[in-house]
Amino acid sequence: MKRFTHPFLLLCLVLVFSCSSDDGPGDDDNIPDPETGELYFPPVGSAEWETTSPNDLGWDTTAEQALYDLLEEKGTDGFIILKDGKIVVEWYFGDFTAGDNHSWNSAGKTLTAMTVGIAQEEGFLSIGDSSMDYLGEGWSMLTPEQEANISVRHHLTMTTGLDYTVDDPFCYDKECLLYKNEPGTYWYYHNAAYTILDQIVTSATGTDFKTYSYQKIRDRIGMQGNWITVGYNNLFFSNTRSMARFGLLCLNQGTWDDTEILSDKTYFTEMTTTSQNLNPSYGYLWWLNGKSQHKAPGSETTFEGELFPDAPDDLIAGLGAFDQKLYLVPSENLMIVRLGDDAGENQLGPSSFDNLLWERLNAFIGE
């Protein structure tokens, strides 16, 4: 496997793996660690953002053009690499500009996960509660007893047991929400079950989910962009730098410079580590690399091995349809954003483009 190497980091990895080798809930290999180096944060309300150069970082600039060419060939619109919070690379392709907005697609699930965590921190909900506590009885076609067994955590972990074989798996109308499995016994990437989290937050806080998310995250870290309803989906649209701001927030475990956005570190750890034993490569709506097995959207199959063999083991990611990418590499204080068109597979989350992209990134950044 290709990965970043540094003598001190190698020593840390040896110590970590000597103490833990399972993929169960609470596995902390992927937890972003703000202590690995000082992070820079761009000012809120300003376009100012400090930069650093590949040369200053000792990266292989002879591999930079190959990375650019791949991104251009695969329909990329915006691409940013942050190292220690500073911009190393910021590229826009075709007619797309720094001011243009783009859908995050399912990479926006990471925003929802943090919003739920903030609502819990503020005492509006508990993810261990039944969803019925916030949605009321009869939100689905299940019996009251079956509804009572589905918790908010099950929605965060894709384990509600709702029937994903319905005609429209995005539909969250009552008639579309049928029983298939006991909650917590089966993992499937079911978008309707995820989107219901918006209703849960709205009911729990008394504030519309979109507004609550803006107030608690977007506005406080200088993002722009909006949640837009498209069919049954609530999709977040923003410019590329706004996605990078959110990635930087997550790289620092929910703290923006000296401002706590999500101060509940227990929730943050649960969000960014294995959340259940059915798909060790999934946290609370975040994808996790370096695990022994994974499942993929649209498939019931369990695949042996990690998500992206060429990516760092501690990578965590927000992944959206048509290859929207938010990558965090905590061990290197590295954050990467890719927004654009489908790179060839039309996948809802992970795709072969991830590994191809990491081959070029490894050559540029260093293995």
How would you name each of these model-derived features?
Residues 122-158, 207-239:
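Active-site helix/loop module of the DD-peptidase/beta-lactamase fold
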Residues 332-341:
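Short, well-ordered beta-strand elements
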Residues 8-16:
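Bacterial N-terminal signal peptides
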Residues 85, 102-128, 155, 196-201, ...:
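Active-site SXXK
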Residues 98-99, 161-238:
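Catalytic-site signature segments of enzymes, centered on catalytic residues
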Residues 1-8:
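Bacterial N-terminal signal peptides that target proteins for export
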Residues 19-97, 102, 120-125, 289, ...:
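N-terminal leader/targeting segments and the immediately adjacent pre-domain N-terminus
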Residues 222-330, 343-351:
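Penicillin-binding protein/beta-lactamase superfamily catalytic region
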